C-alpha cells in the first residue's frame, strides 16, 4: 500500500512560556522576600492551625519548605499562578466566607493578599533564589481538556507544581489539549490540541519551542529508536482523514501522512525496534501494521461485535501488543513478534471501558483505567490475567495513566462528568463545584489511593517518561 508524499514543514511558534520558567533566573533579588514579607503574614494569621504541633490537613505554613510541600490533599500554591493556587482561592473565593475568617480567625487584609499573590505570580521564590520544583525533576503532565491548560505534577511531592495556560500562548480555552508524550530524560514534552489542529513541543521548563500542524490530533507515540513520532486522530472527530501522521520531534516537521484505509484511526503505537507502526479503528474491528522501510501494510480483522479499540501499546520486549475494547470490556493480547502479522493470542474480560494501558519497565504489569466503571485494573502480563482492581475516592470516569520514574506511584486522570467525586471546597464556580476533575495518586506498594489532586476541567491525557 502506498504512502502519501511528504507534507510541508510545520509552523514553529516564536512564543515562549516565560511565566512558567522554573529556573531561578533574575530571582536573586527576590530571595529575601519570603522571609521579610510572606512568612510574617503566615505566622500572624495562619500559625494557630498550620504550624508547630497543629498542622490541619497536613499543611505546615511555618516555612517555605512546608508551604511548597503542600497538604494531604495537594499543593497549597502553584508558582506563577496565584489565581489557581488553593491558598489564594480559599482566602478570596470560598463559598460561605473567606478562610480563615469562616473558622473564626482574622481574615487576610487586602494588602496581605496583594503581597502574597504578587509573590506567587512572581514565581514564589524561596530563600535559595529559585522557584519551587526548579531543575531536572520527574514530572507527570495531565491535560485539562475542558479549559485549555496542562497540569505539571511533581512526583516527589505529589502536588501540581505548575499549570501551563495555553490561552497565554495565543490559543483559546476550547483548544482541547488531549494527549501527552514525554522524552525519556524529561527534556521535552509534547501535547496534542484537538480543536487547534496542533502538536506542541515544550521544554521541561514549559517553554514552547515547536509546533506541527495536524488535523484533529489525538494520541501520540514516540519511536523508541529515533526522533520520530506518530499521531492518530481524535476520538472526537466523526469522519477524520484515514491517515496517521509521522513527524520528526527534533525539527517538529511533518514527514508524511500514512494511509491506514480505515475510519477513525485513533489508537497508534510502534514496534519496539521502530520498524513498524500500528493503528486501530474506533469504528471497525480492524487494525493495520505498516512496514516503514518498504511501505507495505497489512490489515487485520478482530472478531466479535464492535469493540472500539481505544489505544494500542507494545510491551518493552516487543513481543506483545495490547488494547482495550471500550464497548465490550474485552482486553486483547496480540502476538507482535512477527510485526507484520499480529494475531490475537488471548482475550480476557475486564471492568467496563478499558482505556490507555501502560506498562512498567519490566513489562510484567499493565495498568489501565476503566472509564465507565470508576476503577483501575492491574494486569499480570506473565499470566495475562487480571491481578488487582482498585477503586475508591477520586476515581470518577478515569481516563489516562502514567507512572513515576521510580514506579512507586501511578497517576490516573479522572474527568468526573458523572459527579461521583465531590469538590472539597466550593468556590462559586459552577463547573468546578459540580465537576472537579482529579488525578488520583496510587501507591503501588499497597495499591491504595494516597492522594486526590483537584486539577481542572476534563483532565484527559496523562504522560510521564516512557518505560522503555
Label each PLM-derived region with a short phrase.
Residues 6-10, 26, 268:
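Intrinsic disorder/low-complexity segments
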Residues 10, 106-109, 180, 357:
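Alpha-helical interaction segments
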Residues 16, 33-34, 63, 78, ...:
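Short, solvent-exposed coil/turn linker segments
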